[in-house]
């Protein structure tokens, strides 16, 4: 009876071993399947195209648009080979709301009232500023508004009013609004030479001349405008023109005879004609 029982034990052991092997093979196959699935998933995610057919259809017109835009925005050159660019639009530019007060001396209030009808139209129509004359504070008030387009309009308007308060004529002061390269230079006689009493009066007389002939000669030769306000001298004009007029006035203050100054003005006038 011992042999049959021994055989049964061996068969039972072999069956158990087979079940263990089958379980291990199943587990290994499942692990391989999972790895294969993971690999398939990785391959699939990389293989999926990022753009669909609809996206491609939508992207094609955009490419054509960019090409068309590139064709329309070609660089244009002028005759000398320099690139030509279109002017920047002023619609996006905004001017800050600012105000400025220009003080008026007491002796210029009456002339300001008399020619006020000539002063405010260029400020309002040309520079698009708001202007008023304050009689209580004796100032001219300027202010920008939503219709102002020029950034430097307030400064130009203040220079125009300031030129009139210094003694320049309205027609001469309006040139400050039309031209950008005009300036006003002010200096005193004592800055050149310390003079008092009759010596100061004679220096002012030499600058003006008889009936203002010397002053007019300097203005016509140098294309400037000169105002003699007591011991102060105001010159309106371009940078180089102001320098020429200042040299003539300084030479008169230092005592040069008017005849010599006239000779120098003739040479200056001839040079000006050659330049322009």
Curated annotation (Swiss-Prot):
**Region of interest called Disordered, as start-end residue ranges on this chain:** 1-39, 51-92
Name a Pfam family for this protein: KH_PNO1_2nd
Biological process (GO) annotations held by this record are: endonucleolytic cleavage in ITS1 to separate SSU-rRNA from 5.8S rRNA and LSU-rRNA from tricistronic rRNA transcript (SSU-rRNA, 5.8S rRNA, LSU-rRNA); endonucleolytic cleavage to generate mature 5'-end of SSU-rRNA from (SSU-rRNA, 5.8S rRNA, LSU-rRNA); proteasome assembly; ribosomal small subunit export from nucleus; ribosome assembly
Comp. bias intervals (Polar residues):
13-34, 51-75
Compartments, as annotated in UniProt: Cytoplasm; Nucleus, Nucleolus
* Residue ranges of every copy of the KH domain listed in the record: 197-249
Give UniProt keywords alphabetically: Cytoplasm, Nucleus, Ribosome biogenesis, RNA-binding
Stored SUPFAM superfamilies: Eukaryotic type KH-domain (KH-domain type I) (SSF54791)
InterPro entries associated with the record: KH-I_PNO1_first, KH_dom, KH_dom_type_1_sf, KH_PNO1_2nd, KRR1-like_KH1
GO cellular component terms given for this protein: cytoplasm; nucleolus; nucleus
Q: Kindly list the GO molecular function terms attached to this UniProt entry.
A: rRNA primary transcript binding; unfolded protein binding
Its biological purpose = Required for small ribosomal subunit (SSU) synthesis. Has a role in the processing of early nucleolar and late cytoplasmic pre-RNA species.
Query: Subunit structure, briefly?
Result: Component of the small ribosomal subunit, ribosomal RNA processing complex (SSU RRP complex).
* Family assignment from sequence similarity: Belongs to the PNO1 family.
The name on file for this protein is Pre-rRNA-processing protein PNO1
Q: Which organism is it from?
A: Candida albicans (strain SC5314 / ATCC MYA-2876)
């Amino acid at each position: 009876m011992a042999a049959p029982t021994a055989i049964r034990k061996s068969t039972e052991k072999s069956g158990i071993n087979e079940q263990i092997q089958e379980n291990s093979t199943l587990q290994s196959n499942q692990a391989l399947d999972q790895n294969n699935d993971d690999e398939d998933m990785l391959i699939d995610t990389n293989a999926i195209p990022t753009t669909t057919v609809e996206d491609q259809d939508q992207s094609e017109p955009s490419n054509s648009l960019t090409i068309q835009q590139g064709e329309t925005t070609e660089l244009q050159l002028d005759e000398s080979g320099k690139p030509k660019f279109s002017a920047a639009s002023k619609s996006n530019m905004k001017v800050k709301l600012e105000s400025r007060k220009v003080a008026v001396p007491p002796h210029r209030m009456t002339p300001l009232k008399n020619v006020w009808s000539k002063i405010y139209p260029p400020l309002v129509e040309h520079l698009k500023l708001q202007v008023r004359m304050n009689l209580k504070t004796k100032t001219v008030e300027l202010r920008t508004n939503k219709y102002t387009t020029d950034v430097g309009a307030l400064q130009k308007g203040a220079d125009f009013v300031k030129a009139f308060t210094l003694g320049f004529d309205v027609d001469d002061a309006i040139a400050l609004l039309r031209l950008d390269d005009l300036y006003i230079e002010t200096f005193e006689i004592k800055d050149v030479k310390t003079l008092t009493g009759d010596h100061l009066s004679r220096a002012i007389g030499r600058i003006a001349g008889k009936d203002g002939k010397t002053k007019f000669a300097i203005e016509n030769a140098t294309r400037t405008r000169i105002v003699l306000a007591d011991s102060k001298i105001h010159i309106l004009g371009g940078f180089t023109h102001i320098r020429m007029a200042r040299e003539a006035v300084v030479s008169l203050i230092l005592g040069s005879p008017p005849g010599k100054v006239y000779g120098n003005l003739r040479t200056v006038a001839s040079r000006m004609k050659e330049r322009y």
